[in-house]
């Protein structure tokens, strides 16, 4: 269990970096559909 890559597991890094990316893409598409992102 302690023989992971460094001190932080790789799946935890992927989760913490994946959620904001998916959230940003979701907000971007939501803005495009609602008309807020059409001016970008």
From Swiss-Prot:
Pfam families associated with the record: PsbJ
Gene behind the chain: psbJ
Species for this entry: Ceratophyllum demersum
Signal peptide range in chain numbering: none
GO cellular component: chloroplast thylakoid membrane; photosystem II reaction center
Protein name: Photosystem II reaction center protein J
Role this protein plays: One of the components of the core complex of photosystem II (PSII). PSII is a light-driven water:plastoquinone oxidoreductase that uses light energy to abstract electrons from H(2)O, generating O(2) and a proton gradient subsequently used for ATP formation. It consists of a core antenna complex that captures photons, and an electron transfer chain that converts photonic excitation into a charge separation.
Superkingdom of origin: Eukaryota
Organism placement in taxonomy: Eukaryota, Viridiplantae, Streptophyta, Embryophyta, Tracheophyta
Subunit architecture: PSII is composed of 1 copy each of membrane proteins PsbA, PsbB, PsbC, PsbD, PsbE, PsbF, PsbH, PsbI, PsbJ, PsbK, PsbL, PsbM, PsbT, PsbX, PsbY, PsbZ, Psb30/Ycf12, at least 3 peripheral proteins of the oxygen-evolving complex and a large number of cofactors. It forms dimeric complexes.
Similarity remark: Belongs to the PsbJ family.
């Amino acid at each position: 269990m302690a023989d992971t890559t460094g001190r932080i597991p790789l799946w935890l890094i992927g989760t913490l970096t994946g959620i904001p990316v998916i959230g940003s893409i979701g907000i971007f598409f939501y803005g495009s559909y609602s008309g807020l992102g059409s001016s970008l």
